[in-house]
Amino acid sequence: MPKRQAQRRFTRKTDSKTPSQPLVSRRSANYQPSLWQHEYLLSLGNTYVKEDNVERVTLLKQEVSKMLNETEGLLEQLELIDTLQRLGVSYHFEQEIKKTLTNVHVKNVRAHKNRIDRNRWGDLYATALEFRLLRQHGFSIAQDVFDGNIGVDLDDKDIKGILSLYEASYLSTRIDTKLKESIYYTTKRLRKFVEVNKNETKSYTLRRMVIHALEMPYHRRVGRLEARWYIEVYGERHDMNPILLELAKLDFNFVQAIHQDELKSLSSWWSKTGLTKHLDFVRDRITEGYFSSVGVMYEPEFAYHRQMLTKVFMLITTIDDIYDIYGTLEELQLFTTIVEKWDVNRLEELPNYMKLCFLCLVNEINQIGYFVLRDKGFNVIPYLKESWADMCTTFLKEAKWYKSGYKPNFEEYMQNGWISSSVPTILLHLFCLLSDQTLDILGSYNHSVVRSSATILRLANDLATSSEELARGDTMKSVQCHMHETGASEAESRAYIQGIIGVAWDDLNMEKKSCRLHQGFLEAAANLGRVAQCVYQYGDGHGCPDKAKTVNHVRSLLVHPLPLN
């Protein structure tokens, strides 16, 4: 794949309104150029998408649907659903899965009312699998199904059960104290299993699953990446079902071909905006932006949602770099005011680089507003405008903190930071497309779902990028704010931040089973948190994608198809 290795040159003077205007020194983040040239993206293709394969997929889907309807054992039904989810093809069978899990939930409720031991399976693995799948799909199930045997009494020999409990524990809420405690006990035993069996070939597949889970639990992983990984693992299992494996591979390649076409179109759009040409300090990350959109919603039916989401990601990246790196305080204050007023008539007051950015923003938001008005019958533009203005206001506050050397405490930082994370703006756009509910239900987007997702992204970003951003002279991030306020060490502050991320996930889990918002929106909000944990797991995957495994993720999802043999 072609790469440009040369460092980008950064403009060092403003776009002067008059020849006499003095030069202004600008900061530079020295972001690397895009690793994905437009011409290369246009060359992407998938040779596995053929007419006979399309017919084969139809037949395989019929076979799997038959399996779902005819599988009798309750544990076997749950295992089939779990396998379909992990392979990334469960979206084809939503009705069958909902029917099965509804029946499981009804039996669970009856057992509770009749005071029957709900740990009826006789083993930890099955109980934890049932718990995880029901919680994952929004059904109410209490932690007491485990009958208290989820702590020090765990059987070290039951690694399959311990792994199942470990995965289930990450669907806890704030009130599930026993379940949350089990994370410590299961993690300890799983790590011991990995160490003891490092040279044991008989336990290879299970050990691989355990290592993968310890790196990041299944509930917090990006579904599409997990499907790519699990298809390979599943193919090595002795109990593999060839029908499921073949469907997963064919479907992955078909969906990838759709994604490739969308990426080509978006790359052309990005090139035509001219933003990276005229604002050469901006991160050129259209491919990474689209990867994030796929992480939020990968299903073929959400093509327009991904297109809109990617454009929003790129506009946010551009504006963030203006505030974070390039703009003077005077320019940023003026830009914020004009965004607040949404006043195109004041365009001439802006320097040239800001004119292009603002006009591009206005055009894209108006287009989104047009489609929502056409398809749903209500005008969302005032809401969208307000969200961009609020985000820019938080960007401006952070710029002022930097210019003045002000050090906010942790609470003050987070009050500003959850909005500057851009998640409220992103999710508001998605809500407009996904739901027919009134926008007022979000409460000016200060809803627990939005706030929790924003907290995850804000803090995951901070944990990954703090050292780099501070090195170039940036505002203190959450880790440094906590250290400065409490006197804690960096390690202690990072552990504290990780704890807050965990609480945010607890709140998202609670909303999944109790919230009245559109279920697709709830899943998208959680997926945005998953994307954040993925992109920033090994470093700044947006600013330096080659150093944080983002490049590998892009290749596996958008470049390389799965071989069928």
Swiss-Prot record:
PANTHER family xrefs: OS04G0344100 PROTEIN-RELATED (PTHR31225), TERPENOID SYNTHASE 3, CHLOROPLASTIC (PTHR31225:SF255)
Binding-site list for Mg(2+) 1: D320, D324
Upper taxonomic lineage: Eukaryota, Viridiplantae, Streptophyta, Embryophyta, Tracheophyta
Disordered: annotated segments: 1-28
Main function: Predominantly involved in sesquiterpenes (C15) biosynthesis. Using FPP as substrate, the major product is (E,E)-alpha-farnesene with minor amounts of (Z,E)-alpha-farnesene and (E,E)-beta-farnesene. Using GPP as substrate, could also be able in vitro to synthesize monoterpene (C10) with (E)-beta-ocimene as the major product and with (Z)-beta-ocimene and myrcene as minor products.
Name of the protein in question: Terpenoid synthase 3, chloroplastic
Induction details: By coronalon, jasmonic acid and wounding, but not by salicylic acid, cimene and limonene. Also induced in response to the caterpillar P.xylostella or P.rapae feeding.
Presence of keyword Transit peptide: yes
